[in-house]
Amino acid sequence: MRIVDVCGFYAPQGGGVKTYVERKLKAARPGHEEVIILAPGARDGTVREEAGGAIVTLATPRFPLDRRYRYFDNEAALHGLLDRLAPDVVEVSSPWASPAMVARWPGAAFRSLVMHADPLSAYAYRWFGGVASREVIDRGFDWFWRHLRRLDRQFDMVVSASESLSARLRAGGLGKVATIPMGVEPGIFSPERRDPALRARLLARCGLAPSATLLIGIGRLASEKRWPMVIEAVTAAGYSQPVGLVLFGNGRDRARVVRAADNNPHVHLGAPILDRAELATVLASADALVHGCEAETFCMVAAEAKASGLPLIVPDDGGAGDQFAAGQGCRYEARNPAALAAAIVAFVAGSPAAHRARAVTAAAGVPDMDAHFARLFATYAALGGRWSDAA
């Protein structure tokens, strides 16, 4: 079964999507599945080959709002490459222009729309949530819901990584939604990587002793991640308890994040962690992951933290909230800095060690990516086979 993933969100400097698609190549079983990642790039060509497939790029322009990324703009060229690749299954992982291009491709492949992004949460709900309810916002963005319902009719399947997103898509009128949760890279994240000396060094960067509570934040410095809100909440919580925050990341919102952290010596900003083993060690060595974004469809870093035995302090909405387990951290009202500050205070007062002990016990049960891909490939084989027979 040849699967072509038309992946508009892939970039060499990318985060969760890059991790996801590169693991997909490793999960494909030669002789059973062949995975071709078709990504926008600087030039036409093959940029990586694995036993289970390859990453192929189509020459495209840069995305003007984030120049790390590119976007598909030539439908004829995309159709021509799909003709040459002749997939049995074609996936699209962007809800914008590329799925409409794939829907118009005349090939006979099984079509799957994978919801790696949730634009309504990332943009509309964030921009207008302070002045209107979600129901009102949805009515204002009915053009986008009509677009999604049209794609639902044109595609054979819509894949969602979390039940909360699936429920919202179904409520919006989509009828082909299947929830297939993602997972973490196998063999990397573990509570056994905990390093007390590293924990002490990170707290020292925050000007705090090892007796303080160490919170870790990881992610792009972008407005939807709400890092200034997180910093504000950590600062407020720090008036009653010694709490340090180490935030690893980079992005277009860096100047705003730096300004937010300027007045708190207990907040340290670090560069992105590119080495996966180092990331796993940092996660296992902290006392909790703190997260401000409610717009992710899955929240890979929260899953990686859980697999590392790390409690979560996360919003009650979106992919991060779906990762939460009672007794292993705190959940707070999304978009509310006062609620986040109260959650941090409650976490510290409620014994971080006890929260971590429960999280360590649960860590082995966090699903890995290979299980996700095995289920995804099996679903394609079953549904695609029936669809082909029906055709």
Residue ranges and their predicted role:
Residues 41, 164, 183:
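Carbohydrate-associated surface elements
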Residues 255-277:
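Nucleotide-activated donor-binding/catalytic signature segment of Leloir-type glycosyltransferases, i.e.
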Residues 269, 326-337, 345-352:
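Conserved acidic donor-binding segment of nucleotide-sugar-dependent glycosyltransferases
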Residues 294:
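Aromatic "clamp/platform" in nucleotide-sugar-dependent glycosyltransferases that forms part
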Residues 353-385:
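A charged, aromatic-enriched C-terminal amphipathic alpha-helix characteristic of glycosyltransferases
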Residues 311-314:
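Short hydrophobic beta-strand element within catalytic cores of glycosyltransferases
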Residues 119, 137-157:
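Membrane-proximal helix-turn-helix segments that form the acceptor-binding/catalytic region
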